């Protein structure tokens, strides 16, 4: 399962209990039992937004969280900054799928990437960034900073840019 702003902490410790005796448990440290995800967009990417969009993050099939990106004519788009918490459902083989769909420079764009090896206590910060190529075309990329993996997925969008690019 996945929820916004709902971290789950826990710990376990093996011990034996004997009848008529006091058992000392000692110190138990609770840790995050989920993987945390936050979504960001850099200013260059937000400047390319021309309509509403959504970033969907899914770790357990059928239980995605939707991070809204809201277009505001004449002002900077706003977006969901909450941290999502995801159950780690498949041990070291747990995979996260990130899908952006929205209006970029007047066209509906969709980009999907996956990150494998998701673990409890990981915090993945996903940042969508504008990318200007040497040819002058603008595009965007997804950069995922986390404790496990840093990945970049590129998608070229035809565009022109003035200035020092």
Predicted regions and their residues:
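Tryptophan-paired
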Residues: 1, 19, 49-124
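Short, low-hydrophobicity acidic/polar segments
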Residues: 1-36, 42
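Structural motif
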Residues: 40-50
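Hydrophilic extracytoplasmic domains
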Residues: 116-165
């Amino acid at each position: 399962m996945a929820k916004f702003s709902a971290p789950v902490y826990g710990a376990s410790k093996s011990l034996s209990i004997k009848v008529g005796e006091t058992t000392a448990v000692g110190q138990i440290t609770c840790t995050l039992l989920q993987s945390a995800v936050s979504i960001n967009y850099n200013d260059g990417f937000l400047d390319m937004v021309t309509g509403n969009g959504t970033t969907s993050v899914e770790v357990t099939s059928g239980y995605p969280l939707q991070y809204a990106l809201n277009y505001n004519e004449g002002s900077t788009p706003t977006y969901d900054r909450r941290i999502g918490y995801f159950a780690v459902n498949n041990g070291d083989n747990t995979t996260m799928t990130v899908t952006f769909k929205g209006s970029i420079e007047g066209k509906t764009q969709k980009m999907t990437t996956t990150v494998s090896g998701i673990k409890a206590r990981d915090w993945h910060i996903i940042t969508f960034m504008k990318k200007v190529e040497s040819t002058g075309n603008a595009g965007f990329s997804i950069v995922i900073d986390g404790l496990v993996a840093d990945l970049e997925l590129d998608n070229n969008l035809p565009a022109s840019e003035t200035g020092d690019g």
